Amino acid sequence: MGRVVAIDFGEKRIGLAASDVMKSIAFPFKTVEASFQLEKTLETVAAALKEKEPIDLIVVGLPLMLSGHDSPISIKAKAFGEALALKMQTPVVFWDERLTSKQVENNLREQKLNRKERAKASDVLAAQLILESYLNKL
């Protein structure tokens, strides 16, 4: 029985979260630095995710516009997710993550974290929220 992992895709950093093997709880896992080279970013993410194998499913967050249409970053997230599915030979689903980053930012501000601390934690916590949202729909 494998895990479900989630990805909060960004051009600078990528947040990763993983479920327990029962697929009921989402845990923040790791933040990795993105590269301008897709293949290098894929290698970095795939290497990080190998720590959580076996993986049954990868959930990639899509930061859609409020209208529901693709944003420039959601188009890149789709391309990344499709390439990662091929690389890891693991199914990928895309999950609407509108306002996830804003929710995380508000939560971190309430904790009185400075900007540097918020930036460090926001991507991995956004991945956790994406995964929680997905797991709650199962």
What are these regions (language model features)?
Residues 8:
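Conserved catalytic-loop position in the HRD/HxD motif
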